[in-house]
């Protein structure tokens, strides 16, 4: 069996998109890892499965798998990509994407960018969640120079660390340590943020289950909320990421809106070796190698 896929990205945060609305595709953890592998698979930050909606108000259900096979409850960049696909296919400018954490209402803009209502920011420690009660404005989770996190839930957990120089942070070393910090029972996405102006933030991200990525939509939302809560910015700002920038707004009703571009890189077909149930089993090496 061969399945077609789309390779899409939002600011370089890239996805393998598989349409399973008519033909179910129960991806195994091993298959997800194989597809996401950048050397032997297609390669991506996340795999996105399009499934039939559970909620009557939704156009479809979006399932998100990380490169390690774990599931994510939210991904802002993937939501924009999926909303653009549905809008293009239906001719409608407004689309509702269902995820494991709720409904996300999206609007296709005239310039091709997409605005997503990411829902309300979750600020209570039980909603992140944390392993113990703390004021999420200042959480005693840290490693090395990264201390004093501001935690925000955006359908997935985020810990934002404000620094003087985001480029100087060794995120490849500190990211995995903080992702698995004991205060984060579901692990955590880690953002390092440098405020450049009241409406401009430089941010780098370590995503749980994926590592360093070029952009993170939900992380950008969490960063703006954290900065506004600490009085470092207003309630709307550009978030400058490795792959480009997103415009984030935190409205008075608590909802966070994200606007940014989408792109399709290419289409392709998954070979049988990458599909669930058909991954080759490990074969022992022969005792001698033929000449």
Curated annotation (Swiss-Prot):
Catalyzed reactions: (2S,6S)-2,6-diaminopimelate = meso-2,6-diaminopimelate
Listed GO biological process terms: lysine biosynthetic process via diaminopimelate
Binding site for substrate: 13, 46, 66, 76-77, 156, 189, 207-208, 217-218
Pathway field: Amino-acid biosynthesis; L-lysine biosynthesis via DAP pathway; DL-2,6-diaminopimelate from LL-2,6-diaminopimelate: step 1/1
EC number: 5.1.1.7
Site (Could be important to modulate the pK values of the two catalytic cysteine residues): 158, 207
Entries under Pfam families matching the protein: DAP_epimerase
Keyword annotations: Amino-acid biosynthesis, Cytoplasm, Isomerase, Lysine biosynthesis
Keyword Ligase: no
Gene3D superfamilies, per the entry: Diaminopimelate Epimerase, Chain A, domain 1
Record field: transmembrane: none
PROSITE patterns named among the record's database cross-references: DAP_EPIMERASE
Localization in the cell: Cytoplasm
Active site (record annotation): 75 (proton donor), 216 (proton acceptor)
Molecular function GO labels: diaminopimelate epimerase activity
GO CC terms, sorted: cytosol
Quaternary structure note: Homodimer.
Function noted in UniProt: Catalyzes the stereoinversion of LL-2,6-diaminopimelate (L,L-DAP) to meso-diaminopimelate (meso-DAP), a precursor of L-lysine and an essential component of the bacterial peptidoglycan.
Family: Belongs to the diaminopimelate epimerase family.
Listed name of the protein: Diaminopimelate epimerase
Species per Swiss-Prot/TrEMBL record: Rhodospirillum centenum (strain ATCC 51521 / SW)
Lineage: Bacteria, Pseudomonadati, Pseudomonadota, Alphaproteobacteria, Rhodospirillales
